Amino acid sequence: MTLDDVMNFAADQERGREYELADPVDGTPTGIKLWIVGPDSETAHKARLALSDELSELADADGRVSAESREKARLNCLARHVIRWDVKEGDEAVPFNTKNLLRLLNVQWVQAQVDAFAADRRNFR
């Protein structure tokens, strides 16, 4: 591997990769598709910085952040890794926006799948 390979690998992660959520019980495809950036992308880097800023703003005078606030900040960070989607509700496409994305990510098994995919560099080769 050369320095060019390293730099190109990180830059390529910015495009994101398609991930289709799997049914949490039987693993079958759900038809819900998300495009997620890789952990070395600039978008992921900015998401981590925004997480730090958000936690700093939420801290009380003693530097403590409630568990509820930490969880909200973590979900916001995870949402910043998703750059587009193909999601339907009934027969209608669901608009891609932060509110709708956080609504989806509030489901525990969805969070787990998105987080695992986003963190695994093998998905971005």
Located regions from the model:
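Short, surface-exposed, charged amphipathic helix/loop patches that serve as local interaction elements
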Residues: T28-R125
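Short acidic-hydrophobic surface loop/beta-edge motif
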Residues: R15-P29
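Extended acidic low-complexity intrinsically disordered regions
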Residues: M1-R15
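Generic marker of residues within folded, mature protein domains
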Residues: F9, P24-D26, K72
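Extended hydrophobic/Leu-rich segments
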Residues: V6-A10, L21, F117
